[in-house]
């Protein structure tokens, strides 16, 4: 999980979602997981 000021999809399978007001990227590739904060 990477914590970044700006989250962007890295590949085609990355999905940008919101959980409890936090923007996150979820993907098949665990390296692509990101969280805004």
From Swiss-Prot:
Domain of life (superkingdom): Bacteria
Gene behind this protein: rpmJ
Family in the record: Belongs to the bacterial ribosomal protein bL36 family.
Keyword annotations of the record: Ribonucleoprotein, Ribosomal protein
GO molecular function: structural constituent of ribosome
Pfam families given in the database record: Ribosomal_L36
Protein name: Large ribosomal subunit protein bL36
An example Gene Ontology CC term for this record: ribonucleoprotein complex
Example GO BP: translation
InterPro entries to which the protein is assigned, alphabetical: Ribosomal_bL36, Ribosomal_bL36_sp
HAMAP family in UniProt: Ribosomal_bL36
Stored PANTHER family: 50S RIBOSOMAL PROTEIN L36, CHLOROPLASTIC, LARGE RIBOSOMAL SUBUNIT PROTEIN BL36C
Keyword rRNA processing appears in the UniProt entry: no
Keyword Ribonucleoprotein: yes
